[in-house]
Amino acid sequence: MINFLMKGVVSMIVEAIEKYPLLVIFMLVLLLVMIFVIVYYRMSKKYEKSQIELKESLLAATTLNRCIHALTYHSEIDDAINDLLCLITEFFQGDRAYIFQIDYEQNTTSNLFEYTEEGATPEINNLQNVSLETIQYWLDRFKVDGTFYIKSLEEEVDKNSETYRLLKLQNITSLIAVPLIENEIITGFLGVDNPRRRYDNSSLLSSVVFFVSESMNRKQQEQKLKAMSYLDSMTHIFNRNALIE
């Protein structure tokens, strides 16, 4: 039966070629053109996608280099970190970027640095000595995933949780954050509120946190040395440097 049908189809094709050779040639050319267009379209889409990915990678690398430069060449660490947060906010097109430090002895975390875009409300004064219980969900996610990412506050976070309450008060609908780690202990975190672009790309933040930790450690050492310079090594009371200051 199949052989009979195949013979019938072949005979019809042969008959069509004999009767309408130009039409058959036209149809074949049209088919080849369609195949070429489809292949070209798919290749152009792949090329366009690869170009976008390359552009994004170059932008991330450039931003990382600028962040490292800011941390390395600024004489004032506070200014350096502020510039870094500005660059990160710009990269993600967020409302604000910030650094929190954890105090395990007091069981609290505090906002040490914050950069806010125009139109965004500063929150640093409202986020001092926050109970670690409030961000326990964050810490758990840091330990499991290495990042903390919320695409939609309303859809992803329990409305009865402390995390929801805290973020809702700050008009935060989405965020991305990565932990600061020292000796395998989470000492704080770096985050961006309401990122409008690249919100699912934590690679830049993950690359930056090492240099941020180093800069913050350097600042702590400088503060310790400065404090020591104010005390007499024998009596441990304030010396001339403290009086001058």
Residue ranges and their predicted role:
Residues 99-140, 146:
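GAF sensory/regulatory domain recognition
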Residues 151-173:
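Signal-transducing coupling segments at domain and membrane junctions
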Residues 173-181:
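A short, aliphatic-rich beta-strand micro-motif
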Residues 31-38, 42-73, 225, 235:
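Signal-transmission linkers at sensory-effector interfaces
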Residues 188-198:
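Short beta-strand-to-loop transition segments that serve as allosteric relay/switch motifs
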Residues 196-217:
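Amphipathic alpha-helical "output/dimerization" segments
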Residues 70-112:
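Helix-loop-beta substructure at the N-terminus of cytosolic sensory domains
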Residues 69, 223-245:
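Conserved nucleotide-binding and Mg2+-coordinating catalytic segments in signaling enzymes
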